[in-house]
Amino acid sequence: MASFKLRAVGGADRFDEGECRKSLALIWPPDEWREIRALPSGRCQSLQGDPDEVIKAIADLVDESVYWCINPIQPNAKHANKSTVLRRDWLLFDIDPVRLKGVSASDIEKRSASLVASRIVADLSGRGWPVPILIDSGNGYHLYYRIELPNDPLAQSAIKKALVTLAERHDTPEATIDRAVHDSPRIAKIPGTYARKGAD
C-alpha cells in the first residue's frame, strides 16, 4: 500500500514530538487556525499552525488523549463548530478493529484494520484518487485524503455518501470504517500522542 505513514506512540506522560511535527507539516499549514482538544475533559485551545506553538499546546494536554480539528477554522475562533469551519480540506477514513468497547486493540486486531485500509487505498487509487496520508491511530488506522470542498450541506452529503459506500464495500467482520466522521468540525487524534483506551 503506497502512502505516507505516521505512527501513534507514547506513554502516559510523554508524546513523540518528532511524529507530531511530521503530521503538522503534512496536515496543518502554519497560517491556518485549528482547535486542539483534550478528551475526556474537553480542555481546548484554538491557535495558528506554528509548529513550536502547537507543540507547546499539545505538551500542556498530554495527560489526556489529544485531538485536532482536521479542517481550518476562522482566525481567533474559540471553538471548531459548523459555523466556524472555513472549508473542508481533508476526507478522513477512520478504520478500527471490532473489539470490546474501551479495550485497546491487540496486534492481531490491528492487522485486520490494516487490511481494510489497504483495500480502501487500492480501490481508490484504481479510480484515480491520490495517495493518502496513512496514520497509525494507536488502535487502528486513519487515512487522510486531500480534498477541496466548501463547508456546506452538499459537501457533507457527499462525504457521508463516500464513507457509507466504502464501508459497504470494504467492512469485514473483524474491522470497520466509521461512517459517522462526516461533520466539518471533525476531530481526530494527533499523531505522536498517546492512544489512551483500556489497558496497554
Where are these regions (language model features)?
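Helical (often loop-to-helix) elements that flank the catalytic cores of nucleotide-handling enzymes
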Residues: 102-125, 147-175, 196-200
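DNA replication initiation on ssDNA origins
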Residues: 1-90, 95-107, 111, 194
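Histidine-centered divalent-metal-coordination microenvironment in nucleic-acid enzymes
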Residues: 90-93, 124-158, 185-195
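A generic structural signal for short, non-catalytic loop/turn and secondary-structure boundary residues
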Residues: 29, 60-63, 84-86, 127, ...
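Conserved short beta-strand edge segments in small beta-sheet-based binding/regulatory domains
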Residues: 67-69, 168-182
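Alpha-helical structural motif
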Residues: 16-20, 50, 54, 116, ...
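Catalytic micro-motifs at enzyme active sites that drive phosphoryl/nucleotidyl and oxygen chemistry
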Residues: 76-83, 120-138, 174-179
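Short glycine-rich, low-complexity/disordered patches
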Residues: 32-41, 129, 176-184
